[in-house]
Amino acid sequence: MLEQVCQLARNAGDAIMQVYDGAKPMEYARKQDDSPVTAADIAAHTVILEGLRTLTPDIPVLSEEDPPAWEVRQHWQRYWLVDPLDGTKEFIKRNGEFTVNIALIEQGKPVLGVVYAPVLKVMYYAAEGKAWKEECGVRKQIQVRDARPPLVVISRSHTDDELTEYLQQLGEHQTTSIGSSLKFCLVAEGQAQLYPRFGPTSVWDTAAGHAIAVAAGAHVHDWQGKTLDYTPRESFLNPGFRVTIY
């Protein structure tokens, strides 16, 4: 099933690129929570939703662009969790740092994850405790790697006082910034050692990257030390968290 989901992510990426390259209008707007949405978000959502319903008709889908009501999903034990275009701000800025995120959740845990960056033509994916990176048709297994001083990856679009204070207290380190779920993937492939997050995220922002990071040997915990949990709850918001190899 993993390969079929990877192909779905590629197809969604193709739909996004039609808008990104100007073949279709962007039609940029704002949602109720003031987050941006484009025609590319909707196009990718449609591709993934139709594909997953064909691939696994018995597994429900929670997508950022059409989340079912709480009453519908409150008893879900197994479901797909999708962000058709993670990093819409990066898409609008045209810096290429946006991704397609698809995760399979079982009993609150992300057991399969796919993150595809269509501009960069890089795919990360994980299942059954193993993680891979595919680039230019070449696939390699990835795992975390220690480095001193550690490289800390932070959000390109979201900074806050809590993060600034945390970094000041961290000790010797280097920082880099990148958009979307690629932060999880940098830790997973050994390029970075820590991704701290204080600002708001939603479950669809993190689940696929979470699966990949954990399969590569990282830990994804909230600031109380608990593993991020995707058991259905009324709010889609995550607590603050960190992705770390330590």
From Swiss-Prot:
UniProt subcellular location: Cell inner membrane
EC identifiers of the protein: 3.1.3.7
Binding site for Mg(2+) 2: D83, D86, D205
Keywords noted in UniProt: Cell inner membrane, Cell membrane, Hydrolase, Magnesium, Membrane, Metal-binding
Catalytic activity: adenosine 3',5'-bisphosphate + H2O = AMP + phosphate
Residues in coiled coil: none
Disulfide bonds: none
Main location: membrane
Listed GO CC annotations: plasma membrane
Gene3D superfamilies with a match to the protein in the record: 3.40.190.80, Fructose-1,6-Bisphosphatase, subunit A, domain 1 (3.30.540.10)
Cofactor (UniProt): Mg(2+)
One BP annotation, GO: sulfate assimilation
Binding site for Mg(2+) 1: E64, D83, L85
Membrane topology of this protein: Peripheral membrane protein
Induction remark: Strongly repressed during nitrogen excess.
A GO MF label: magnesium ion binding
UniProt binding sites for substrate: E64, L85, D86, G87, T88, D205
Job description of the protein: Converts adenosine-3',5'-bisphosphate (PAP) to AMP.
NCBIfam families from the UniProt entry: bisphos_cysQ, PRK10931.1
Family that this chain belongs to: Belongs to the inositol monophosphatase superfamily. CysQ family.
PANTHER family: 3'(2'),5'-BISPHOSPHATE NUCLEOTIDASE 1
Protein name: 3'(2'),5'-bisphosphate nucleotidase CysQ
Source lineage: Bacteria, Pseudomonadati, Pseudomonadota, Gammaproteobacteria, Enterobacterales
Gene giving rise to this polypeptide: cysQ
